[in-house]
Every structure is written in C-alpha cells, then in structure tokens.
Amino acid sequence: MSATAATAPPAAPAGEGGPPAPPPNLTSNRRLQQTQAQVDEVVDIMRVNVDKVLERDQKLSELDDRADALQAGASQFETSAAKLKRKYWWKNLKMMIILGVICAIILIIIIVYFSS
C-alpha cells in the first residue's frame, strides 16, 4: 500500500452524487440557532412595544392632567362669568330705575305746568 492511499478521504457511498449529509447534531444546532434568532427578534419587538405602551401611558397621564386643569379653569371661568353677569344686571336695573324716575319727574312737571 502507498502512503497517499492511506491518507486519502473515504469515497462517497455509491448512489449519492452530492456532498455528504451533515450530522444530525449540526442540523439541530442550526435549527436551535434559527429559533433563538427568532426568539431574540420577538423579544426586541416586544421591548419596542412595551416602550411604546409606557410612552403612550405617560402621554395619556399628561393629557389627563391637562384636562383636569382645563376643567378647573372652565369651572372658575363659569363662576366668574355668573358673578359678572349678576353685577351688570344689577347695574342695568339701577340705570333703568333712575331713567324711570327721571321720566316720571319730567311727566309730573309737564302735567303740573299745563294743568294750571
């Protein structure tokens, strides 16, 4: 036997023309790596989703605070508007009473002047 014949790789089995099939352990490792990559991708997506939910919650909280402040301001405005309306109603009533008294005095003067 020659030295080159002893170190040559074994020939492929008869009937198979392609490369030898990978060992089952290598295939399961590849599947495990693919599955792990998918899991990592899902974890990254879920982290982004959780961050978005937390950001949305913060924005909703700020919006709720602003709505409460706006409601308080609206209530205060309504109270102030009612007081102002009442104030000007009384002022208008006083003006009408004064105008009525002046008209009555003028009418009395005219009646007294022309009746004599």
Swiss-Prot record:
CDD domains assigned: R-SNARE_VAMP2
Maturation and modification: Phosphorylated by PRKCZ in vitro and this phosphorylation is increased in the presence of WDFY2.
MF terms in GO: SNAP receptor activity; syntaxin binding; syntaxin-1 binding
Topology feature Vesicular, residues: 115-116
UniProt keyword annotation of ATP-binding present: no
GO (cellular component) term, any one: vesicle
Transmembrane segments: 95-114
Region (Required for interaction with SEPT8), start-end ranges: 92-116
Positions in the Cytoplasmic compartment: 2-94
Keywords: Acetylation, Cell membrane, Coiled coil, Cytoplasmic vesicle, Membrane, Phosphoprotein, Synapse, Transmembrane, Transmembrane helix
BP-aspect Gene Ontology terms: cytochrome complex assembly; membrane raft distribution; regulation of delayed rectifier potassium channel activity; signal transduction; SNARE complex assembly; synaptic vesicle endocytosis; synaptic vesicle exocytosis; vasodilation
Task performed by this protein: Involved in the targeting and/or fusion of transport vesicles to their target membrane. Major SNARE protein of synaptic vesicles which mediates fusion of synaptic vesicles to release neurotransmitters. Essential for fast vesicular exocytosis and activity-dependent neurotransmitter release as well as fast endocytosis that mediates rapid reuse of synaptic vesicles. Modulates the gating characteristics of the delayed rectifier voltage-dependent potassium channel KCNB1.
Name of the protein in question: Vesicle-associated membrane protein 2
Organism: Bos taurus
Gene that this sequence comes from: VAMP2
